[in-house]
């Protein structure tokens, strides 16, 4: 965070005050000596962000595929050596996402519908989601101070991975990146995200085979279609004691 002296106007009264503003940096990822992408992101958990981004973009199958990862915070560059499983020609098919920070993905999220079908078996009581979301939306100290970040969390029996970033997709990649390195069982996790759920958010969740995604906000039509085709549980507007179930209601008992 960085503090600025600003003028606050409330009910016609002007006041000079200090205001905390969230930080934004351009992180350029260099993969095996070639510049891959520049992510506009918050300057924290950058190694987790890189690991999660490479995984959800399909460049690798596990964290151990990375043989070297260093982040230069003076130049805001991440240098990655990795055993890549992605066809090189797809590098020219960048898709700019709808999320904050002008994110990039290297596949069409609609293609996920043709490849992933989640198994049944994982269930949770509806009341549990209300408790999870209540704690989730009050967990971000950065949001409390700046109002300028999104959050994502992975919740399972082993605990919670919680991350902030100015972009929803970045926050999710950070959580996934840490989960990969801790080798958590993604198939037994619930993913939480703040704000709108678009197709690329659902695609990242399905890449990990996570069965449940819940948000305090709304999904897009493509997010709902992908979730239904993949048998994923998608919850929106989880607030107070209510929620909308857009797909996969069989997992809520």
Predicted regions and their residues:
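Extended, folded domain segments that form the structural surfaces/walls around functional sites
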Residues: 104, 118, 122-133, 169-182, ...
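Intrinsically disordered, low-complexity regions enriched in acidic/Ser/Thr/Pro/Gln residues
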Residues: 1-155, 160-162
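Extracellular/luminal Protease-associated
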Residues: 182-219, 227
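C-terminal binding/interaction regions
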Residues: 222-253
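General beta-strand structural signal in soluble alpha/beta enzymes
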Residues: 162-163, 193, 214-215, 234-237
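Glycine- and Gly-Pro-enriched alpha-helical subdomains that act as flexible
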Residues: 142-191, 195
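Short, solvent-exposed amphipathic alpha-helical segments in soluble enzyme
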Residues: 44-45, 54-55, 168-170, 178-181, ...
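Short beta->alpha linker loops
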Residues: 167, 196-197, 218-219, 238-241
């Amino acid at each position: 965070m960085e503090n600025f002296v600003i003028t606050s106007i409330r009910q016609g009264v002007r006041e000079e005050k200090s205001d905390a503003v969230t930080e934004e940096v351009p992180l350029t990822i260099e993969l095996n000596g070639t510049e891959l992408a520049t992510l506009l992101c918050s300057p924290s958990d950058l190694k987790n962000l890189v690991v999660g981004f490479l995984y959800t973009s399909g460049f690798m199958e596990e964290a151990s595929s990375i043989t070297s990862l260093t982040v230069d915070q003076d130049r805001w560059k991440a240098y990655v050596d990795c055993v890549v499983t992605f066809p090189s020609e797809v590098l020219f098919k960048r898709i700019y996402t709808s999320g904050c920070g002008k994110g990039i993905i290297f596949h069409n999220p609609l293609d996920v519908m043709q490849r992933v079908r989640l198994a049944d078996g994982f269930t949770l009581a509806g009341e549990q989601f209300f408790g999870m979301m209540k704690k989730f939306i009050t967990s971000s100290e950065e949001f409390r101070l700046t109002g300028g970040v999104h959050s994502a969390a992975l919740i399972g029996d082993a605990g919670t991975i919680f991350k902030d970033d100015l972009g929803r997709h970045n926050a999710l990649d950070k959580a996934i990146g840490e989960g990969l390195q801790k080798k958590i069982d993604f198939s037994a996790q619930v993913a939480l995200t703040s704000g709108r759920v678009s197709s690329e958010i659902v695609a990242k969740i399905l890449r990990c085979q996570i069965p449940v995604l819940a948000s305090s906000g709304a999904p897009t039509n493509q997010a709902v279609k992908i979730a239904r085709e993949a048998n994923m549980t998608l919850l929106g507007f989880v607030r107070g004691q209510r929620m909308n179930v857009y797909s996969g209601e069989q997992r809520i008992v």
